[in-house]
């Protein structure tokens, strides 16, 4: 998920 919403 660290690719488009939660960095």
UniProtKB/Swiss-Prot annotation:
| Sequence positions bearing Phenylalanine amide | 7
Cellular component, GO annotation? extracellular region
Example GO biological process term? neuropeptide signaling pathway
Q: Which UniProt keywords apply?
A: Amidation, Neuropeptide, Secreted
Its annotated compartments are:
Secreted
Q: Where this protein primarily resides, as one coarse class?
A: secreted
* Physiological role: Increases the rate and amplitude of spontaneous contractions of semi-isolated hearts. Increases the amplitude of excitatory postsynaptic potentials in abdominal extensor muscle.
Family the UniProt entry places it in? Belongs to the FARP (FMRFamide related peptide) family.
Know the name of this protein? Cardio-excitatory FMRFamide homolog DF2
Origin organism of this chain? Procambarus clarkii (Red swamp crayfish)
């Amino acid at each position: 998920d660290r690719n488009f919403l939660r960095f």
